[in-house]
Each structure stands twice: as C-alpha cells, then as structure tokens.
C-alpha cells in the first residue's frame, strides 16, 4: 500500500497538484521507503520499478537505469509490471543506457506477444509517431503468427480511432 501511495505521489493528478514543498517532502519519504523495501526484500520487482519512477522524477538517470534493470531482471515475464516499465521507459527514452534500452525492447516484445499487451502496444503505435519505428523493428523479429496478430490489433485500433460516419 505504501508503494502504491508513492506511485500516486509521483504520477497522479493529486500528487502533481501538491504544493511543491509538500510534494518534494513526500517524494523524499517515498524514496527512502521504496529503497528500504527493495533492500529488505531484494526480489520485490515492483519496488524497483517505483524506485525507477522516483529517480525519473528527480532526474537521476543512473538510478533510473539500474532500477529499471533490476525490476526487469526480477520479473521479466510479469506483464502488468512490463506495461508500467514500458510507459516509464518511453517517457524517458533519451536517458536510457544500452542495457536498460535492451530490457525495454524485451518488455515491448513480451507485450506484443500477449493478448492484453498487444492492444496496449497497438494503441501506442497508432497514437505516437516516434514509437512506430522502434516497435516495427521489434515486431519484425517475432514469429509470423505474432506479427499477423499485431497487424490485426493495429488495424482494429486504427478503425476504432476513426470518427463514426454521420447518420442522415
């Protein structure tokens, strides 16, 4: 629960709307708590993700990269966590070092291979032009069946984005 509260402070509208002094104090408290949780339970991949999120908030690329890497190493196939890592990595792509970037690409491949994840990736592909080249390069390395599923999901997403035809 404490870790989820820290995510809310870092990324929710409530957290973003806090007065700067209170928000900074809450982020510092969260940073200490999450670092403590990760140290006390070194297999707690979510704590490392939140540590990466907090590092991004304070513009600390070293911790961002190492914490993203730790989260991925501990939970490489946890889709819900991969979704969180992908969003964080995409938001901070220029700060990713080669190892973190490779982990990010592995998370993207994991998501494309799953029913729920493929929709998330197709939605991002349709919405963010800068994402298309990166995900296309990854999808092209996957088995033909997964590529076809991605194209179908993408077509569905694009069709859903089209405005409805006016009724006479």
Would you name each region that the model predicts?
Residues 1-17, 41-54, 79-91, 117-121, ...:
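Amphipathic alpha-helical repeat scaffolds of TPR domains
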Residues 4-17, 26-30, 43-53, 143-154, ...:
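Charged, low-complexity, helix/coiled-coil-prone segments
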Residues 11-24, 56-63, 96:
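Short coil/turn connectors between adjacent alpha-helices in alpha-solenoid helical repeat scaffolds
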Residues 24-38, 62-72, 98-115, 136-140:
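Alpha-helical repeat scaffolds
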Residues 27-85:
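A contiguous binding-surface segment within folded domains or other stable secondary-structure elements
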Residues 86-97, 102-103:
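Short linear, low-complexity motifs centered on an aromatic residue
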Residues 102, 106-168:
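Terminal, low-structured helical/coil segments at or just beyond the last alpha-helical repeat
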